[in-house]
Curated annotation (Swiss-Prot):
It is an enzyme of class 2 (transferase). Homodimer. The RNAP catalytic core consists of 2 alpha, 1 beta, 1 beta' and 1 omega subunit. When a sigma factor is associated with the core the holoenzyme is formed, which can initiate transcription. Residues 242-318 are annotated as: Alpha C-terminal domain (alpha-CTD). This is DNA-directed RNA polymerase subunit alpha 2. It comes from Francisella tularensis subsp. novicida (strain U112). The N-terminal domain is essential for RNAP assembly and basal transcription, whereas the C-terminal domain is involved in interaction with transcriptional regulators and with upstream promoter elements. Signal peptide: none annotated.
């Protein structure tokens, strides 16, 4: 079959069946294309769209150190953590971190997210119940908000007075797809793709789908078609002048699990990315300590490399 004769979806339906929840259907697609598109869009929405979320919580300036500690409200420490973690948050462009603070004192009252003090550039997009405060003793809750992409597991449960949380940065909280049969004229061997998307409200479902499709399109834009390849049109390898060691993955340094996880948390994948970081930049990474720094410096030294190295013409899209 000629490529120009492949079907494209012309029947597109959008069903916003609940708040921040939409079902999209696309038909008709060639057999197998529905699954290919559905899987790619799902994975991209869940793991490749940037967002912000609560990553750690401190209660009473770090004096509350256990989930079993007693606090002056009806909820447990675990309840408070879950409620604060569920806050849908956004950070303004150029703002990478923020802080949410609740300072409670006085009489009994129910506390909602609208009563929080927010750092500059931070916003909570929906009202969320936090706790039923019993009055009397003071209660202070501080939450750190960060930007990121995908999922980042917490390396510890509690450190330096903070409860550390698994971070899910994507504004898409659920995405799944289903493939059904479709027909066009006499052809019955076609696909209908149904995508079910739910977001936390920071972006709407249509915007999330558009972002995912655009990301996939950008990943594919440098792949030329067969005719262009036959004409001898090739994309120059941007890594041809770079030391091959720098293009290896950091896993090949055989670091301890703790050091490896710290590098993953800040999206350092290649040795070349690592050596361009300074000691101070690495020490600012979550859970990154001097022991990990020493280990990394020793491993790099064995290869004749060091931190703080400037690499000219380092490709930004490896």
């Amino acid at each position: 079959m000629a490529l120009e004769n492949l079907l494209h979806p012309t029947n597109i339906k959008i069903d916003e069946y609940a708040k921040n929840a939409t079902k999209f259907s696309f038909e008709a697609l060639e057999r197998g294309v529905g699954y290919t598109l559905g899987f790619a869009l799902k994975q991209t929405m869940l793991y490749s769209i940037a967002g912000a979320c609560v990553t750690s919580i401190k209660i009473n300036d770090g004096k509350v150190t256990s989930l079993e500690d007693v606090i002056p409200c009806d909820e447990t420490v675990a309840d408070i953590i879950l409620n604060v973690k569920s806050l849908p948050v956004t950070l303004a462009e150029g703002v990478e971190t923020g802080t949410i603070t609740f300072e409670l004192s006085g009489s009994e009252e129910e506390i909602f997210s609208e009563e929080a003090k927010l750092s500059e550039g931070l916003a909570i997009t929906e009202e969320v119940f936090i706790c039923s405060y019993n009055g009397g003793k003071k209660l202070k809750i501080e939450a750190k908000v960060e930007k990121g992409v995908g999922f980042r597991p917490a390396q510890d449960n509690f450190k330096d007075g903070e409860f550390l949380l698994d971070a899910t940065f994507s504004p898409v909280v659920f995405c799944d797809f289903e493939i059904k049969d479709a027909r066009v004229g006499r052809r019955t061997d076609l696909d209908k793709l149904e995508l079910n998307i739910k977001t936390n409200g920071n972006v709407n479902c249509e915007e999330a789908l558009r972002l995912a499709a655009t990301k996939i399109q950008n990943q594919l834009r440098n792949i030329v078609d067969i005719e262009e390849i036959n004409k001898g049109i090739f994309v120059e390898d941007p890594t041809k002048d770079i030391n091959p060691i720098l293009l290896k993955h950091v896993e090949e340094l055989n670091l301890t699990a703790r050091s490896s996880n710290c590098l993953k948390a800040v999206n350092i994948r290649l040795i070349g990315e690592l050596v361009q970081k300074t000691e101070n930049e690495l020490l600012k990474a979550p859970n990154f300590g001097k022991k990990s720094l020493t280990e990394i410096k020793d491993k790099l030294s064995e290869l004749g490399l060091s931190l703080g190295t400037l690499i000219e013409n380092w490709p930004q899209d490896l």
